[in-house]
Amino acid sequence: MSISLKISHISSFSNDGFNSVKQCRVSQRFEIRSVCFRRSPGVESRRIHLNSDLSSRNLRNRCVGSDVVTGEISGRSIPDWAYSGVKDETLSDLEPELDDGDGGDENGNNDGGGNGGNGDGGGGGGDGEGDDGEDEADKAEEKEFGPILKFEEVMKETERRGITLPEDMLEAAKSVGIRKLFLLRYLDLQGSVWPLGFLMRSCAMLRNRMLADPSFLFKVGTEVAIDSCCATFAEVQKRGEDFWSEFELYAADLLVGLVVDVALVGLLAPYARIGKPSVASTGLFKDLKRACASLPSSVFEAERPGCKFSVNQRIATFFYKGLLYGSVGFGCGLIGQGIANLIMTAKRSVKKSEEDVPIPPLFESAALWGVFLGLSSNARYQIINGLERVVEGSTAAKRIPVVAMAFTVGVRFANNVYGGMQFVDWAKLSGVQ
């Protein structure tokens, strides 16, 4: 545990006024905000001699600014200085020295410790700036998601409401704690009407996405509604009078589209990362699994403390999600087209007609779905997620949430119309339809 001793201002040193050795023996780290050495007669400027149990390599200093001492005409102001056992090279009058256990007098005659400190003093500045960056990031996360609640606080809140947390959330509360906003959102959502409340308690994938983005279900519903309406309109226009005689083809397309819509939105949706990552450390593909788990959910996912992504990770995400999209498309196409082909074959075994359209090839149709989702849909939905993130973070959307909802409806409608026309072109070019 680190104890911090903060000295705001020292105007002079006397034999009895301040004993730096005694004060600093109780601390491994302290800060001197401003030190003034008066050059007036009768006041003796002294060097501070420091003892520390840490080696000089583990101690550092950083300059954090300057603090001009007003009203001290004969005084000299030293820049603000965060001290960890090694002097700043710019402070020639302030020469703290280290005692590695051999002892040193109050006047700082232990030159070996001081020189050792100078060897590593330059590297401390970077560490200090990194600490400040982490502190700012933690403050930003706490402002957005609330403080981290410890296990006792979590249990107190859940017991007050008479609710039992899922196992993974309990483990997270015991190990690292849970953000207050995530906990309160879960407690509210798990009490929703069926089936949402049931799914929040039993399906971690849905729960984590709802905790990170409460509008997740709205986006899924918007995607399904728009795609179903557009598909129905296109099928009626294309098939005309044969729509009902070819209804099984329409039903197969609608079924595949429903599953695909959920996958398109869900695979790119941000999700709450609760607790420590639970990636298996053994197995043939352990490194690959760990790398995939560290990727963002989409190319344009926002960074948060403890959730930073490099450019290479974002590029890799595009190809990784494309592979997942392609797998979903191939699987859904195989099942959906397979069902449609079985229905068509059964009907034609009972009654044949010269106007019957050819039965689409099964594997070629599934492959078309896979390639289309992996390339076209992947690129379009990555862009949509990025645009939605920009709009949702805008001042207008925060003041009027309907703005973000209207944008979601509009951009996804335009995407469905364009994607439908593009799929028809791809199907014709491939010879599947």
Curated annotation (Swiss-Prot):
Q: Which UniProt keywords apply?
A: Acetylation, Chloroplast, Developmental protein, Membrane, Plastid, Transit peptide, Transmembrane, Transmembrane helix
Extract the transit peptide range from the record.
1-63
Of the GO CC terms on this record, one is: chloroplast inner membrane
Presence of keyword Signal: no
- The protein's predominant localisation is plastid
Subcellular location(s) per record: Plastid, Chloroplast membrane
Question: Where is the sequence biased in composition, kind Gly residues?
Answer: 110-127
| Position of the signal peptide | none
Q: Does the keyword Coiled coil apply?
A: no
State what the entry records as the consequence of deleting this gene.
No visible phenotype under normal growth conditions.
Regions annotated as coiled coil: none
Name the residues that span the membrane. 249-269, 323-343
Q: Where is the composition biased (Acidic residues)?
A: 93-105, 128-139
- Extract the PANTHER family matched here: EXPRESSED PROTEIN-RELATED (PTHR31038), PROTEIN RETICULATA-RELATED 1, CHLOROPLASTIC (PTHR31038:SF18)
Name by which UniProt lists this protein? Protein RETICULATA-RELATED 1, chloroplastic
Native organism: Arabidopsis thaliana (Mouse-ear cress)
**Encoded by which gene?**
RER1
